[in-house]
Amino acid sequence: MMPDRRSFLAYFSGLGLAPTLFPGVLWGKLEEEKTASVTKEMLRDAAAVAGITFTGEQIDRMLEGVNKNLAHYEELRKVPLDNGVAPPLYFNPIVPGMKIDRAKRTFHAGRPPHATRPRNLEGAAFWPVTKLAELIRTKQASSAELTEMYLDRLKRHNPRLLCAVTITGDLARRQAREADQEIAAGRYRGPLHGIPYGVKDLCAAKGYPTTWGAAPFKSRVIDKDATVVSRLREAGAVLVAKLTTGELALDDVWFGGQTKNPWDLSMGSQGSSAGPGSATAAGLVGFSIGTETGGSILEPSGICGVTGLRPTYGRVSRYGAMTLTWSLDKIGPMCRSVEDCALVLNAIQGPDDLDLTVQEVPFNWDADLDIRKLRVGYLRAAFSNTRQSAQVDANDAAALEKICSLGVKLIEVALPEHSDLDIGIIIYGEGNAALKDPVETQPELLVRQDRVTNQNALRLLPAVEYLNAQRVRTLLMQEMARVMENVDVYLVPFDYGDYTPNPVATMNTSVTNLTGHPCVVVPHGFNEKGDPTSLTFVGKLFGEAEMLALARAYQNATEWHLKHPPLFVTI
């Protein structure tokens, strides 16, 4: 049987010859001869055309390896591999010698805010979880009432925003009814009990389609709950919608169109956690769950003006969620306040024995932590990098000034030496394997045809180069550990990508994803067009509590997170 072109080229990729013409020329010779094996003459001819010289001994050795491996690759490709099958190699962001605080302390939430039910319950659509929870706890509103309010808003506004793939009305009503019965019986589970939320459609929810934003999976039902979904159910939360993801976790375009930014319907919401960013900003859910590999929580949160938390790698189980990159994927909350993010993280974090990268490190949240005791850095090179928007620069400067006014002294920090490591080598190297089947089996159904082209090209990524990129990543992690020895948290301007470029901020997003450090993005003003602007906080590995405490103090001293897109506000 003649091998296919991909398995043939894979052998030369492993030899480091993929970037040359040699593999392609040799494949052409193989097709021309209509044979299933390679001959010495074919190797010599292909080498000559490619401008490479091999000795007779090298050709003899290569010939045996080429033909032997062709058979191995062909057999390997016959093995069905579900996206959920992970390699037995687990990334750990902790470097040798690093000390992690594993002592568990009491979870200390902030004092519940005063909440009075508005005459029109839709007036609570933009309330944070902490305030919605008070309505439920004090029995001023039922979970069923809040659920119907959010379901109605989803049905009315989703046609404009394209932020929900599936509205889970039947499930939501059942869960809300159960929550109300438990609360009436005195079994209150905590601040998420009865709160309606949405989850990015990379996460499985039993009984409903999990589409990954891709047309080939429009009707595909994964008959299990992702760990984040089951843990939120245990906390009493109510699932009202599967929210959009960019196709196969890329950008904000999916098979139904482009998810819109509630602040400006001519713009996309960014991605790939496009639906969570849009729906949370528009007041269509109480909170949402997003995922990130290289910016997919931070970017839509910042663009849509919500508070987005990307936890430490290994904090939250990815079980039941689509894999893009085993060593980079993370799951986290997208909310309307920092305190909300802390409450949701507390519910979803910790080992489940299903995702072996998750570590047993307690989340010791203390809403009243004295932030004056924190060592706070700022990435000077990023703040010194003037953008195309004077207003964004002014907002960054004002945020630093406000944080200093809270009794914090800022320390200059700089990114590590190997910060220019291309995260794409790892994302696309692993993603090419993880998403091989949907891209190869029904490529004509994908919205992003460039994804197919890239997938084919990246079959030629040499294994040696991928592994060496991971080794450079180790150096980067060690360097970052030294940076974080001097600070508990550091501040960075938000990475707006092409909107208002800041190369250092963009590099920070890449670096902290590679090293696994947590980040939270919070609103800090508006630009000249009236679109939200944001600030990024970076914490130590498993140091979300300190990072969120500083972000909460900043948020409480400002009111930017209380601003909402006028098109979706109901008086």
What are these regions (language model features)?
Residues 1-3:
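N-terminal secretory signal peptides
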Residues 7-28:
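N-terminal export signals
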Residues 22-64, 81-88, 366:
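C-terminal segment of N-terminal export signals and the immediately downstream linker at the start
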Residues 133-134, 371, 384, 417-420, ...:
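Serine-dependent amide/ester hydrolase catalytic core
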Residues 140, 145-151, 177, 364-365, ...:
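Acyltransferase
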Residues 156, 234, 281-380, 397-406, ...:
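Structural helix-boundary/capping segments
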